[in-house]
Design a protein with these regions (language model features):
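Short, small-residue-biased leader/transition segments that mark boundaries at the very start
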Residues: 1-3
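A short beta-loop-beta micro-motif enriched in histidine and acidic residues
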Residues: 8-9, 25-36, 56-64, 78, ...
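Conserved short histidine dyad/triad with adjacent acidic residue
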Residues: 14-32, 42-58, 95
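Short acidic (Asp/Glu) patches
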Residues: 15-34, 65-79, 100
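Short, conserved beta-strand element in jelly-roll/cupin
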Residues: 33-46, 52-54, 63-74, 117-118
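A short hydrophobic beta-strand segment most commonly corresponding to one strand
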Residues: 90-92, 108-123
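Short proline/glycine-enriched turn/loop segments at secondary-structure junctions
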Residues: 103-107
């Protein structure tokens, strides 16, 4: 389930996501160009993979025009780090940060997250 609402025009977008984590290999690395992601874990556990976007990965799906998201193919040449997220943790991803949310920690589980998208040019 995903609830999405625009605040202050399109300067802020609030999402409440209830998703199930899964194996890292089933989650797609993504990057945004217009928005900064502030992700807050309300309930659950996940890893978020992340690495600097050096624009060397192959594009799997380009939805920048519609949804400000670009998905990359797997790239074994990048040094992807895994950030553990538990209740009350938050992470901030800028346009130069590739991130892969919803990777399971141990077993797959249902998680609830709040994602605030802040348009870069408002800062």
């Amino acid at each position: 389930m995903c609830i999405r609402d625009r605040l202050d025009g399109d300067r802020l977008i609030l999402q409440i996501n209830e998703v199930t984590t899964g194996p890292k290999e089933t989650k797609r690395p993504e990057v945004h160009r217009k928005y900064i992601d502030v992700q807050y874990m309300v309930h659950g556990h996940e890893y978020i993979g992340f690495y600097p976007d050096q624009k060397t990965s192959m594009v799997k799906e380009d939805r920048l025009a519609e949804d400000d998201v670009l998905f990359y193919e797997e790239n074994d040449r990048v040094n992807e780090m895994m950030l553990p997220m538990t209740d009350g943790c938050y992470a901030i991803f800028f346009p130069e940060d590739v991130h892969r949310p919803c990777c399971q920690m141990g077993e797959a589980e249902d998680v609830k997250k709040i994602v605030l998208k802040v348009r870069v040019d408002t800062l």
